[in-house]
Amino acid sequence: MGACFSVAISCDQAVNNLTSCLSRNQNRFRNLVDHVAALKKTVRQLEARRDDLLKRIKVQEDRGLNLLDEVQQWLSEVESRVCEAHDILSQSDEEIDNLCCGQYCSKRCKYSYDYSKSVINKLQDVENLLSKGVFDEVAQKGPIPKVEERLFHQEIVGQEAIVESTWNSMMEVGVGLLGIYGMGGVGKTTLLSQINNKFRTVSNDFDIAIWVVVSKNPTVKRIQEDIGKRLDLYNEGWEQKTENEIASTIKRSLENKKYMLLLDDMWTKVDLANIGIPVPKRNGSKIAFTSRSNEVCGKMGVDKEIEVTCLMWDDAWDLFTRNMKETLESHPKIPEVAKSIARKCNGLPLALNVIGETMARKKSIEEWHDAVGVFSGIEADILSILKFSYDDLKCEKTKSCFLFSALFPEDYEIGKDDLIEYWVGQGIILGSKGINYKGYTIIGTLTRAYLLKESETKEKVKMHDVVREMALWISSGCGDQKQKNVLVVEANAQLRDIPKIEDQKAVRRMSLIYNQIEEACESLHCPKLETLLLRDNRLRKISREFLSHVPILMVLDLSLNPNLIELPSFSPLYSLRFLNLSCTGITSLPDGLYALRNLLYLNLEHTYMLKRIYEIHDLPNLEVLKLYASGIDITDKLVRQIQAMKHLYLLTITLRNSSGLEIFLGDTRFSSYTEGLTLDEQSYYQSLKVPLATISSSRFLEIQDSHIPKIEIEGSSSNESEIVGPRVRRDISFINLRKVRLDNCTGLKDLTWLVFAPHLATLYVVCLPDIEHIISRSEESRLQKTCELAGVIPFRELEFLTLRNLGQLKSIYRDPLLFGKLKEINIKSCPKLTKLPLDSRSAWKQNVVINAEEEWLQGLQWEDVATKERFFPS
């Protein structure tokens, strides 16, 4: 009986437990399948909203804006909640299988109860987070720097005293407006640049220094625009405001600031009140400007003026001979002749620089005697003196390239590659795989002769305004009235219409860059016109007649006209070799384009509205094709047409189509001419295998909005796929790769293959939620030995490093790196990155700027005290 009684109690308990379980949890168990499905759906919605937000963030950050803290907080919560949700969902199949009794109960009642509860709670969390993820704004502008450093290329000789006296004059209590005047090329801009930079090194109580280049033909609105951008006032509605409205905005901003306004290269009086500049004396603010004319100083009503004069003889001789030591010692009579030539420069720094550099290469006394005869006397015109350096250029092609470079506006920096492509289009140099070598050789010749000046990044060049005047003077026949219409250069002249030309039949080159021209309707009757530059205007309409009578036009640049949607027939342009339609709003290519049998260069980059191009193979002589960031669907058919182009030597391309990408990666012939490759919205691969040969010539590589867990690099001489790591051979090297950008890519854990990009200058890694290391920690020890064998120094030429929104990133590289050219590090929202690969020897002699959140910088670990003092002094 006892045994039966015991069993009865046990059964009762089991029944009671089952009844209790069913009564308490039947709805929870019965609805588990629905709750799991709802959680999956809501997580997908949250991930989609996150991805859309990341795209908006990318656009804003590309504009220099900083991510809002509330948006960053939301993204961090999303990453956390999504990971937690996926962990819960990974158990869903097992838990659903455990349901029994018509899904009213579970084989593991207590555990399933807890699981069902966690699903419901997480669903509520995700729904709540989804509702919070609606943001009108995602980013805002950061603090305005007090001063922006100015770089100057001219050798500083003999200006020490005038810099000090100018600074002291500006600091005088009674001086609010200072005028600096002197002839062209005397060093006024260099002087003003040094004054600007003193605000970085000398203690002062100014709130902001503002630099504006005025130049010829200034407009109030253009000056207002530059000031507005510096004050962070410029926005999308700026163009619709009147000058008076903008002036009021600028005035309100400056009234409560102690400002320093530096206006360079003023040719006429500028009404400061119309611009919105408050009276400087009221709160100790200062305004200084440079001009070639003392008359401008008088018209401006300056409180004090300073004349910048030519150098005294000792300083002039020092500047002239600074690179001549070996030359002066090569013959005993050369110093005497050199002094004769130096004196003819009249102490003008620009002439001394230009002529001195030219003469430094002449080693024989005969060459020096010949140079003396070029100058007619001490009173020779400065353009004639400067022309000597032009005449000394041995190659006629180099001379032609130099003269072409004057078609751009004053102070206009143009990319070296862009300039070379113009030269090819004009037929000055031939296009080929070696184009850059020849073009860069010519640029090197011109920069060494001080006829072109390199930008800070070395990627762009510009002309000194006096040198540009000389080039335009030469192109127009050195003052010969009969040739004055050969060249029409009205760049940055505030034109609203195509200018009237007195003798159209004489015109060979026309540059109307950077104006406000909206329509080009009247026919150009220019039978000799070879070059027409209309880039960076406001073009909306080009009539059929406009281009009907320019039979030998070779270069046509319509780029940077975003409102230009339709184009007339290009059938009359049968001589055209160069066509740039980048950054326009065109929706289709013009009629007659495919009949242009002489076309060598076609640029369709950033034509977002252009969706298709047809029969590209009908352009048999095309050598350069640029399709980066266009809206064109690069289908497998189009890729095969590009494959068949026999003369192509430069290609940029954005691939969104998986079939097109497979054909592209499968043909190593693309390697010889693909300069830039962008993979966009690629989510078809668990492992993307990229043949080394396909990207060995690429200068930039971008991967964005993609899910690719692994990037593998296939070797160039075997069928084995080699992940760039310890087994990489010496021949695996991305020798040409200069820029890498990865944006919103999931799955990638590291970027170890970047070690073998020895010339990488820019690395931009943003929104990679899974990346843990830039260079894999597990491979570093073996990589180090491989690098030594291959002669590779990781990141030795890296200049700019940007890492943002990398929640799992723990390290860049295990050991400190030399970073021989590093200029800037930008870190944001990388909470697990606690140390940079720097020591006290890193970036030696470089002034590295580290931009990061203050809290993150304070918590950063440093190699030692010396390293911290070097990069983050207290």
UniProtKB/Swiss-Prot annotation:
Pfam family, one: LRR_8
Domain notes: The LRR repeats probably act as specificity determinant of pathogen recognition.
Annotated ranges, domain NB-ARC: 139-434
Family of this protein: Belongs to the disease resistance NB-LRR family.
Chain positions of LRR repeats: 483-505, 506-527, 528-548, 552-574, 575-597, 598-620, 621-642
Alphabetized UniProt keyword annotations: ATP-binding, Coiled coil, Leucine-rich repeat, Nucleotide-binding, Plant defense, Repeat
Keyword Isomerase assigned: no
Positions contributing to ATP binding: G182, M183, G184, G185, V186, G187, K188, T189
Gene3D superfamilies reported for this sequence: Helical domain of apoptotic protease-activating factors, P-loop containing nucleotide triphosphate hydrolases, Ribonuclease Inhibitor, Winged helix-like DNA-binding domain superfamily/Winged helix DNA-binding domain
Domain of life: Eukaryota
GO biological process, one term: defense response
Coiled-coil regions listed in the entry: 22-74
Molecular function (Gene Ontology), one example: ATP binding
InterPro entries the UniProt entry points to: Apaf_helical (IPR042197), Leu-rich_rpt (IPR001611), Leu-rich_rpt_typical-subtyp (IPR003591), LRR_dom_sf (IPR032675), NB-ARC (IPR002182), P-loop_NTPase (IPR027417), Plant_NBS-LRR (IPR050905), WH-like_DNA-bd_sf (IPR036388)
Disulfide linkage: none
Function: Potential disease resistance protein.
Name this protein carries in UniProt: Putative disease resistance protein At5g05400
